């Protein structure tokens, strides 16, 4: 036999050497359950687990339902802030229409102020203009070429802007309509 087999592990030596542990183990009666008691205990555990499962399932469904409601509310009211910024622009336009001023210069100044209000509302709504300068390189992600015209400019550069484009939070809402220079 080897040395390991002859010597018991230290834990076993301590338990065997301690007479109080042996007496305590001998004095406690072994709790023996009848099969009916074990079945009853297991059925109780099954009932508790089923109850916990149903509660967790209901909680998950409630969380999902609340998330769907929150998303619906977010979609419904997402434009509210932007709309609040447009109300003063509408007020200015109604005021301009209600005046009988025959002065074209004053009317133009009023329109310029209203345009500034509108651009301010766009900025607050994270909406920016796409207005390429003449000679800028054509960008198909932000520009839509309507025509290709002969020009002294480099090929595929903007010759004119027919309609400004817009982005909302770096997403193109409408590309700028441009004419581009034709290749030579």
Swiss-Prot record:
SUPFAM superfamilies in the record: Coiled-coil domain of nucleotide exchange factor GrpE, Head domain of nucleotide exchange factor GrpE
NCBIfam families hit by this protein: PRK14139.1, PRK14140.1, PRK14150.1
Pfam families from the UniProt entry: GrpE
Transmembrane parts of this sequence: none
Keyword field: Chaperone, Cytoplasm, Stress response
GO biological process: protein folding
Chain spans, region Disordered: 1-35
CDD domains reported in the protein's UniProt record: GrpE (cd00446)
Function field: Participates actively in the response to hyperosmotic and heat shock by preventing the aggregation of stress-denatured proteins, in association with DnaK and GrpE. It is the nucleotide exchange factor for DnaK and may function as a thermosensor. Unfolded proteins bind initially to DnaJ; upon interaction with the DnaJ-bound protein, DnaK hydrolyzes its bound ATP, resulting in the formation of a stable complex. GrpE releases ADP from DnaK; ATP binding to DnaK triggers the release of the substrate protein, thus completing the reaction cycle.
Compartments where found: Cytoplasm
Name of the protein this chain belongs to: Protein GrpE
One GO cellular component term noted in the UniProt record for this chain: cytosol
Family named by the database record: Belongs to the GrpE family.
Lineage: Bacteria, Pseudomonadati, Pseudomonadota, Betaproteobacteria, Burkholderiales
Subunit structure: Homodimer.
């Amino acid at each position: 036999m080897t040395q390991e087999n002859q010597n018991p592990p230290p834990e076993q030596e301590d338990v065997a050497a301690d007479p109080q542990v042996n007496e305590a183990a001998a004095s406690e009666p072994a709790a023996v359950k009848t099969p009916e008691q074990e079945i009853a205990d297991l059925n109780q555990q099954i009932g508790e687990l089923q109850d916990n499962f149903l509660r967790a399932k209901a909680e998950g469904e409630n969380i999902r339902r609340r998330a769907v409601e929150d998303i619906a509310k977010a979609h419904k009211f997402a434009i509210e802030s932007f709309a609040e910024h447009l109300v003063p622009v509408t007020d200015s336009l109604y005021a301009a229409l209600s005046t009988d001023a025959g002065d074209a210069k004053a009317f133009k100044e009023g329109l310029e102020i209203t345009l500034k209000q509108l651009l301010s509302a766009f900025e607050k709504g994270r909406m920016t203009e796409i207005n390429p300068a003449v000679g800028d390189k054509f960008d198909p992600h932000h520009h839509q070429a309507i025509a290709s015209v002969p020009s002294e400019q480099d090929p595929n550069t903007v010759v004119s802007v027919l309609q400004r484009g817009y982005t909302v939070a770096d997403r193109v809402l409408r590309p700028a309509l441009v004419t581009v220079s034709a290749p030579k």
